[in-house]
Structures are given as structure tokens and as C-alpha cells.
Amino acid sequence: MKSLQKGFTLIELMIVVAIIGILAAFAIPAYNDYIARSQAAEGVSLADGLKIRIAENLQDGACKGPDADPSTGVVGNEDVGKFGKAVITDNAYNPDAKEPGDENGCQVLITYGEGTAKDKVSSLIKGKKLQLNQLVNGSYTQGDGTDLPAKFIPNAVKKSQ
């Protein structure tokens, strides 16, 4: 009696492994970029949460930094997320201001890798900063103090080229 063998040959299995390897070579870097972009977007959400505090600061006449000072009414002008920390800086933003006190927006500095999940931040953005300038209408635009690579900056705040 002859027995028939069934199954895949070695060459067929090697071809499948090679195809999977080629697909992985393209997919893994794209996935890492996707993760970094999604983590960078959290910073803008943190900055959005600071808009009320910025408005309170401007009612008091100036942008106030992150240090809490109950005597002046400053209550910790920062917000910590999972992947980063957003801080209102002492710098006002108004390119048309003629004198101090004419500010209509503050600057927010987001530092990635200073959140509650420091060890889970993508190495592509860890330690990078995104500076946001608040405009008159309350929206944000990218500031000059940004060292976050352009491909990770959310489109909503990206500086027009």
C-alpha cells in the first residue's frame, strides 16, 4: 500500500515566512508613528483643559506660570495626563500688543514623557516639547518653542508653512 503525504513543502513555508517578514518591515514603523501621533494628540487635549485657567489669568491681568500661590489666587496652572504635562507659562502671546497688560492669550508648553505613564511614552516623542500660543478666538497654534517633529504635531495646531 502506498500512503499519500499531505501538507506544505519546506519551500512553501519559507515563502510564507518571507512574505510576513516583508509586510512586518512596513507595518511596524507605521504603527510606531501612529502610536506617537496619538500620544502627542493628548497634549492638545490637556491644553484645552487649561483654557478656563488662562481666561482667569488674563482677567487678573497677566499669564501666570505653573506655581500655585494661594495668596494671588493662582491654583496650579498645569495639567498632567498619561503621556505628558501641559503648563501655562509666564509668557503672554499677542503679536500686536503695544504695552504689557494688552495680552489676549497665554502660551502653553507641553512636555511629553512627564505624565503618569512615563515608561509607556513612545521614544519618538519622549522628552520633546510642543509650545502652543492661544489666539484671540481661544484656539491654539504652534509656537516657536516646539521641538516635537512636525509629523507628530496634531493638524489642529500645526503652524502653516
From Swiss-Prot:
Record-linked PROSITE patterns: PROKAR_NTER_METHYL
Record protein name field: Type IV major fimbrial protein FimA
The keyword Disulfide bond belongs to this UniProt entry's keyword annotation: yes
An example Gene Ontology biological process: cell adhesion
Keyword Iron-sulfur among record annotations: no
Main location: other
UniProt membrane topology term: Single-pass membrane protein
One Pfam family in the UniProt entry: N_methyl
Protein family: Belongs to the N-Me-Phe pilin family.
Organism the protein comes from: Dichelobacter nodosus (Bacteroides nodosus)
Compartment annotation: Fimbrium; Membrane
Intrachain disulfide bonds: 63-106
Subunit structure: The pili are polar flexible filaments of about 5.4 nanometers diameter and 2.5 micrometers average length; they consist of only a single polypeptide chain arranged in a helical configuration of five subunits per turn in the assembled pilus.
Gene Ontology CC annotations of this record: membrane; pilus
Gene3D superfamilies, sorted: Glycoprotein, Type 4 Pilin (3.30.700.10)
Propeptide feature: residues: 1-7
PTM annotation (N-methylphenylalanine): residues: 8
Transmembrane intervals: 8-28
Alphabetical UniProt keywords: Disulfide bond, Fimbrium, Membrane, Methylation, Transmembrane, Transmembrane helix
The protein's role, per its UniProt record: Major component of the type IV fimbriae that plays an essential role in twitching motility, natural transformation, and protease secretion.
